[in-house]
Every structure is written in structure tokens, then in C-alpha cells.
Design a protein with these regions (language model features):
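Substrate-positioning beta->alpha
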Residues: 164-170, 183-206, 213-214
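N-terminal Rossmann NAD(P)H-binding glycine-rich loop of SDR-like oxidoreductase domains
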Residues: 2-20
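Mid/C-terminal beta-alpha module of Rossmann-like enzyme folds, strongest
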Residues: 204, 208-261, 291, 295-298
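C-terminal amphipathic/interface module of NAD(P)-dependent oxidoreductases
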Residues: 262-302
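Catalytic helix-loop patch of NAD(P)-dependent Rossmann-fold dehydrogenases
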Residues: 78, 113-160, 180
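NAD(P)H-binding glycine-rich loop region in Rossmannoid oxidoreductase-like domains
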Residues: 42-82, 86, 90, 105-110
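Conserved Rossmann-fold NAD(P)-dependent oxidoreductase catalytic core, especially the SDR/UDP-sugar
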Residues: 86-128
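Glycine-rich Rossmann NAD(P)(H)-binding loop
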Residues: 161, 183-189, 216-223, 232-238, ...
Length: 302
């Protein structure tokens, strides 16, 4: 049986649909409808986990503080690093065999230039959030070496899907309201992963015997521009959009004037990953194409 943290979050709520038997860690302040739950007040370096592991073979650790929550640098460290290490150490004591840690592609950096990020790329966490995830990875590898805990690390690219937060949620709302977008001249190259594909991968990482000890850079394996990506969102929503040919220089100027420079760079920058080792190690390929994944937007659109 699996123990899933972050069960009420965006990815966790979708993961629960792919699992037959699991126990879900839920913060006491959150309501949920899961049959088997373990409640905690918070996740940090002193969280008590003594009653969480009965019958548990593997953990999928999704819970954490994201950059959109805007905590202090210590807030990231307290939850994302110290909380992860505490959970892993307590899991080892209870005899749990495997720990799947959902990290971030931000561990590798903000963008790619000549070639995609790969397992050979030097980590370059660019902010406190990414650093906290990277430090957690280092701590987990140390625990694995010392105890034999089977650690699997997954670094997803931007995760999209129904009710996704962040830039994807913003783009979806924009497309619903306005049939005109400014990405007509965009030729950048970015990798993404749908929440359907990511959750399927996480289940595989928790159960496949070959996954232990590996790090995976997770994507749909479909590299697209922001123009192509927003066209795919529109198609998934059953909408039609017109892409205005706005030069990047003008978009960057608009970003500076509105305080949205970082968002503009995220939308127009390149971020490619080499996900080939997932197929090589696990024999796994994404079950959904981007078009198929985007179709779920219309099914859940209200």
C-alpha cells in the first residue's frame, strides 16, 4: 500500500484517482473524503509519523511549499527539506521500502540553451524553492546510501491539467475570456507534462523494481512553443484563438512596465529535458499525448 502526502493538492488529488489502495496524509485544516487518512498539523523536521506507516510499502511525497505561496527562505527549508528528511528517516525506522520524491525541474535551472537538461546536467537551483528541493534530494540520497531505502526522484517540468495553478491556470482563464493572444511570433521550445501522465509515472515509480535509485526528468516528450501550447489549450477547451504577431521585445517591455518580467521570460524561454532514461529504465512512455491530455480540460470545464 502507498502513503501519499500532499493528497489534497493539485497533483495529489489526481493521483488518488490512479491508486486502488493508499493512505493519504492530510493537514488537519484541510477537509477530504479519503477513506484512509493520517492527519498532521504541519510537515517539518519534527512532524510525528509513528502511526502513519502500518501496512505501507512505499511513499509518494508530494507535500511541500511552492513558490506561489511566497514564504521566507526558511519556510522552504523547513517544509521542503527538513520535512522531507524527517519523513524519510521515520519511514526507514518503520520498514518502508521505497520513497518517491517529487522534486522540481527548477533544480536544473530556469532555462536551456544549446541542449536539453539531462541527468548529466550540473544542478543549478535558481531560487530558494528549487534549492530546498535540491537539498532534500541530497539528504534522501544520503539516507538511501546509509540505510538501503529505495529512493526515486522525479523532477517534473511544468505540470498542466484541470485546475492547475500558476501560469497554466492564468493562461486557461485568459483563453476562456479572450480569443486573442500575443504569441503569434513565438518560436521557443519548452517541455511540459500533463497531470495525467505525471500521476501515471509516479505510480510506476512506486512499484517498478527497476526504479530504485534513479532520478527522472519528467515530460510529455512533446516539445512545443508557447504559441503551440496555448493553441493546444484552446483546442482542449473547445475555443478558437487568434495569435497576434507581437515581437518579443515589445512583450518584454510590457513585462517591465507591469512588473511581470519573470512571467514573460518563463513563457517565452526555452526549457527542454531529456526524458529518455524513463523509457530505458522503466519501459514507460506517456500514456496520453498533449492533445489527449488537453481534452480533459473540456470534460471538467464548468
Amino acid at each position: 500500500m502507498l502513503l501519499v502526502t500532499g493528497a489534497t493538492g493539485f497533483i495529489g488529488s489526481h493521483l488518488s484517482k490512479n491508486i486502488k489502495s493508499a493512505r493519504y496524509v492530510v493537514l488537519n485544516k484541510n477537509e477530504c473524503s479519503f477513506a484512509d487518512t493520517y492527519h498532521v498539523d504541519s510537515i517539518n523536521g519534527s512532524t510525528p509519523w509513528s502511526g502513519a506507516f502500518h501496512g505501507i510499502d512505499a511513499i509518494v511525497h508530494l507535500a511541500g511549499v511552492a513558490h506561489r505561496n511566497n514564504p521566507s527562505s526558511y519556510g522552504y527549508k523547513e517544509v521542503n527539506t527538513e520535512g522531507t528528511i524527517q519523513l524519510a528517516n521515520e519511514a526507514v525506522k518503520a520498514g518502508v521500502k521505497r520513497f518517491v520524491f517529487v522534486s522540481s525541474i527548477g533544480v536544473n535551472g530556469t532555462s536551456t540553451q544549446a541542449k536539453p537538461f539531462s541527468l548529466d546536467s550540473e544542478p543549478s537551483p535558481h531560487n530558494d524553492y528549487a534549492r530546498s528541493k535540491y537539498d532534500a534530494e541530497i539528504g534522501l540520497k544520503k539516507i538511501a546510501k546509509e540505510t538501503g531505502l529505495e529512493v526515486v526522484i522525479v523532477r517534473p517540468t511544468l505540470v498542466y491539467g484541470p485546475d492547475a495553478p500558476g501560469n497554466f491556470g492564468m493562461l486557461t482563464k485568459l483563453i476562456k475570456r479572450l480569443p486573442v493572444l500575443p504569441f503569434g511570433l513565438a518560436t521557443n521550445r519548452r517541455d511540459f507534462i500533463s497531470v495525467q501522465n505525471l500521476t501515471a509515472l509516479l505510480v510506476t515509480c512506486a512499484t517498478h523494481p527497476n526504479a530504485a535509485g534513479h532520478t527522472f526528468l519528467a515530460s510529455d516528450s512533446e516539445t512545443v512553443s508557447i504559441k503551440e501550447f496555448t493553441n493546444a489549450i484552446a483546442k482542449g477547451l473547445g475555443k478558437k484563438v487568434f495569435q497576434l504577431p507581437v515581437p518579443l521585445t515589445l512583450m518584454r517591455l510590457a513585462g517591465k512596465l507591469t512588473g511581470k518580467s519573470a512571467m514573460i521570460e518563463q513563457l517565452y524561454g526555452n526549457l527542454e529535458v531529456d526524458s529518455s532514461n524513463i523509457k530505458e529504465v522503466l519501459g514507460w512512455t506517456p500514456p496520453f499525448t498533449m492533445e489527449q491530455s488537453m481534452a480533459f480540460l473540456k470534460h471538467t470545464d464548468k
